[in-house]
């Protein structure tokens, strides 16, 4: 079964969970309403802290080069600790 989480009325579906980085409780605690505008959220762990970063679908008119979902791999390589646990959730519009 695909894991979903509801935060502040937004439904998110877990699409990647590298090294078991997804923790529903911590994600819910760290979530900020500013993230609701993004189509995807990446959560990465460093120094026992969860950092969240939003990305838009590549076709979203709000997307810039650095905020497109296609840039997630670059983000993980450049801004995250090497080999860190991370996850990606996708906003589901119902």
Model-derived segments and their meaning:
Residues 1-46:
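N-terminal leader/targeting segments and the first structural element of proteins
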Residues 64-94:
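Helix-rich interaction surfaces within compact, conserved domain-sized segments
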């Amino acid at each position: 079964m695909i894991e979903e989480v509801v935060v502040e009325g937004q439904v998110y579906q877990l699409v990647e969970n590298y090294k078991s980085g997804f923790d529903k409780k911590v994600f819910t605690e760290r979530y900020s309403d500013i993230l609701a505008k993004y189509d995807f959220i990446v959560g990465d762990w460093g120094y026992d802290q969860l950092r969240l970063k939003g990305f838009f679908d590549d076709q979203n008119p709000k997307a810039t080069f650095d905020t497109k979902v296609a840039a997630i791999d670059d983000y993980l390589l450049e801004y995250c600790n090497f080999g860190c646990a991370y996850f990606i959730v996708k906003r589901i519009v119902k």
